[in-house]
């Protein structure tokens, strides 16, 4: 009834996967399922703090829904990919012609992406790294990097390290958000990925997440 598609866990992730599958089936019988799933994903977009105000680094992203109360880059990528694919499916259906389509707040999404990209000048997230080797890359969510962190001994400031798979997720999210390729945020993540390009490991993570890294790189 609420549009989600899951078996009791990983609600947003599984809904997004299912929505993508329904979106590539050229059959109008699934239009209602697609619309309801889109609405559930749009309604799950994180808005902490004051509602309607981008006052938290997690605002604008999407999370597991059933597991954590914050957004992360993996779930966000799945959500935005599903929303764009289903948007195309609805546009190509005569049954959906001229009907309003529930959508994400794409500007809020850009706020979340800024909170996860190591470009501190673009966000007020205090955990972003100022180290040149991290510049432009992405972290898992505003408070965590799977590649770990560096703590300044004097200031005790935490800097979250960029890593490969999630930086590809960030680059793809910019594409789905239709951020221009010449935008400095896009250029920065492409530069980081180029500087850290390898097929031997998931940069910053070693062998962990290697096949996911390949999967996103191939896309």
Roles of regions detected by a PLM:
Residues 1-39, 43-219:
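An alpha-helical repeat/solenoid feature that recognizes helix-turn-helix modules
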């Amino acid at each position: 009834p609420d549009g989600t598609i899951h078996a009791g866990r990983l609600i947003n992730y599984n809904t997004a996967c299912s929505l993508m599958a329904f979106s590539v089936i050229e059959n109008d019988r699934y239009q209602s399922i697609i619309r309801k799933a889109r609405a559930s994903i749009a309604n799950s977009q994180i808005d902490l703090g004051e509602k309607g105000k981008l006052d938290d680094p997690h605002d604008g992203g999407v999370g597991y829904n059933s597991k954590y109360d914050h957004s992360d880059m993996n779930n966000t990528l799945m959500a935005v990919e599903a929303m764009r694919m289903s948007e195309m499916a609805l546009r190509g259906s005569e049954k959906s012609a001229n009907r309003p389509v529930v959508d994400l707040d794409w500007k809020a999404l850009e706020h979340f992406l800024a909170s996860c990209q190591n470009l501190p000048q673009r966000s007020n997230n205090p955990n972003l790294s100022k180290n040149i080797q991290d510049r432009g890359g992405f972290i898992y969510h505003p408070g965590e990097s799977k590649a770990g962190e560096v703590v300044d001994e004097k200031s005790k400031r935490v800097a979250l390290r960029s890593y490969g798979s999630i930086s590809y997720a960030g680059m793809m999210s910019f594409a789905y958000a239709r951020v221009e390729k010449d935008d400095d945020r896009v250029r920065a993540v492409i530069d980081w990925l180029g500087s850290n390009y390898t097929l031997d490991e998931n940069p910053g993570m070693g062998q962990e997440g290697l096949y996911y890294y390949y999967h996103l790189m191939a896309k």
